[in-house]
């Protein structure tokens, strides 16, 4: 093998290795038609709510709105994701969905799912909240593990 061929092969092997490093495991989800129970992954509706829990509030004391929950055992193939419990997302029902400040949303993780739950007394939406909230309804969620390209915002080498 000539020096030029060795250099070309090295570039090829390095690019192939970098391409593999730039792949990341991820999970896609789709909506299901059936309405899930409070113990299942879902978007909207009534969340899993342990009897000792409180509805999260924003910096003004206004209740946040339930967006989504993930039953962690439904997620397969992500080593860094919890294997059990429930992960919930709560947001403000404003035009920014609570993303304008760090107190307008909450992510809550329950490490165990208990049968001792209550139905939270969620206050009714006012007209503005109805207009801005991104959900209308309740949906089950199915998860599919996949591999996608990692973000290209960091260049490790130039070949």
Regions found by a protein language model. Name each.
Residues 1-157:
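Preference for intrinsically disordered or flexible, low-complexity segments
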């Amino acid at each position: 093998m000539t020096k030029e061929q060795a250099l070309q092969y090295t570039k090829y092997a390095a690019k192939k290795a970098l391409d593999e490093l730039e792949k990341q495991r991820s999970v896609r989800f789709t909506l299901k038609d059936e309405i899930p129970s409070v113990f299942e992954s879902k978007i909207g509706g009534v969340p899993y709510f342990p009897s000792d829990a409180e509805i999260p509030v924003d910096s003004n004391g206004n209740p946040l709105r339930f967006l989504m929950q993930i039953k962690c055992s439904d997620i397969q193939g992500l080593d860094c994701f919890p294997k059990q419990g429930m992960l919930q997302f709560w947001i403000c029902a404003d035009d920014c969905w609570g993303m304008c400040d760090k107190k307008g949303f909450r992510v809550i993780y329950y490490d165990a799912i208990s049968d001792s739950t209550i139905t939270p007394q969620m206050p009714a939406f006012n007209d503005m909240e109805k207009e801005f909230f991104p959900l209308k309804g309740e949906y089950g969620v199915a998860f599919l593990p996949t591999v996608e390209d990692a973000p290209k915002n960091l260049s490790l080498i130039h070949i």
